[in-house]
Amino acid sequence: IGFRYTVFYKEPETVYDPRFDDMITHEDYPYPVGTIVFERIVSAKGTTIETLCGGDIVAVCAPGSEYSGENASSVIDSANVSCKKAEKAYSIVYKKGDALHRIFFNPDEEFLNHVREIAPQAEFC
């Protein structure tokens, strides 16, 4: 079992296609820009666990840090898509309906930078 995190942070680039003598979009994204997708990978097949819009992200907390903002005591643990224990993983807190949810995951620095781009309102703790 593995996990994949994808952040759609920019529009697909256009490339020149000589067949049409025009610039075309090489690929279409399955999600709008500003979306994060968390997937579980089993036998090379991905199952979507959660899809987040950048505007719904409330906080991204480093290992050992906790979200302490409004309604912090009512955060619901939704998923652990990390190969590490929850205490050693990053967490992302997001709004879903009227509730706050949390996912534990292990991003790299590049991923975190893209999250900062799509969710400038999010608290990084």
Where are these regions (language model features)?
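Eukaryotic intrinsically disordered, low-complexity regulatory linkers and tails enriched in Ser/Thr/Pro
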Residues: 1, 16, 26-27, 123-125
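Canonical phosphoinositide-binding patch of PH/PH-like domains
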Residues: 78-80, 91-93, 98-110
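Surface loops and adjacent helix of pleckstrin homology
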Residues: 8-10, 39-41, 106
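Phosphoinositide-binding peripheral membrane targeting modules
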Residues: 2, 38-76
